């Protein structure tokens, strides 16, 4: 029997099958899901910003450039093989825009771009993503199957 494990904002969790990882409220944030399909272990990070920059200390799960290393380390501790890791992501919306004015800061785009940079650096293929738009998402990640269910208001639900 599976448990649903909630991942909060600027948080990350790892688990083994048959558990499900879930995060809600993905606007400009990214939900990045990484798993090993053979060992059936994986994790999810709810990333808020692209880089930690010069911010000392703080929460490494908040930033794409620091969360990815931590997420992979924790998944490997569960018995995953780095060579088998695969990723999926969702989120990265442009939540605040005003007619006739340029998008403010484009945090969603920058978050998605930085996650891709980090995945390439780590040698982890991104299998599929559901990013962009102007709507929020809630995601459920099955670490056993690798299925990522993406739910949105007014845009339906899909499994990627």
UniProtKB/Swiss-Prot annotation:
**Key words of the record:** Chemotaxis, Hydrolase
GO BP term, example: chemotaxis
List the SUPFAM superfamilies hit by this protein, alphabetically.
CNF1/YfiH-like putative cysteine hydrolases
Please state what class of enzyme this protein is. hydrolase
- This protein's source sits in the domain of life called Bacteria
Q: Which InterPro entries match?
A: CheD-like_sf, Chemorcpt_Glu_NH3ase_CheD, Cytotoxic_necrot_fac-like_cat
* Documented EC number(s): 3.5.1.44
One GO term in the molecular function aspect is: protein-glutamine glutaminase activity
Its recorded reaction(s) are: L-glutaminyl-[protein] + H2O = L-glutamyl-[protein] + NH4(+)
List the Pfam families hit by this protein, alphabetically.
Answer: CheD
Q: What role does it play?
A: Probably deamidates glutamine residues to glutamate on methyl-accepting chemotaxis receptors (MCPs), playing an important role in chemotaxis.
Record family assignment? Belongs to the CheD family.
Please give the name of this protein.
Probable chemoreceptor glutamine deamidase CheD
Q: Could you tell me which species this protein originates from?
A: Desulfitobacterium hafniense (strain Y51)
Q: Which gene encodes it?
A: cheD
